[in-house]
Amino acid sequence: PDKYRVVYTDYQRLELEKEFHYSRYITMNRKAELAKSLDLTERQIKIWFQNRRAKERKINKKKDVMVKEP
């Protein structure tokens, strides 16, 4: 398989999480800046944000279920 999984460093994850906390959607300019400073490609950052939003939806769904259950 030519597809490999990117393993982010703790620092990269922390910076991406901080950015996500600030805004769930990243601008093109900010994506370019982050890519440079974190030594990642813009594509990797785009995909990290997509995955992180999906994770948040999943977490929120679980919360909904917990609230609805008696």
Swiss-Prot record:
Entry's localization field: Nucleus
GO molecular function: DNA-binding transcription factor activity, RNA polymerase II-specific; RNA polymerase II transcription regulatory region sequence-specific DNA binding
Keywords (A to Z) from UniProt: Developmental protein, DNA-binding, Homeobox, Nucleus
Pfam family, one: Homeodomain
DNA-binding region per Swiss-Prot/TrEMBL record: 1-60
A single cellular component GO annotation: nucleus
Entry's family note: Belongs to the Caudal homeobox family.
Protein name, UniProt field: Homeobox protein CDX
Organism: Lineus sanguineus
Gene it is expressed from: CDX
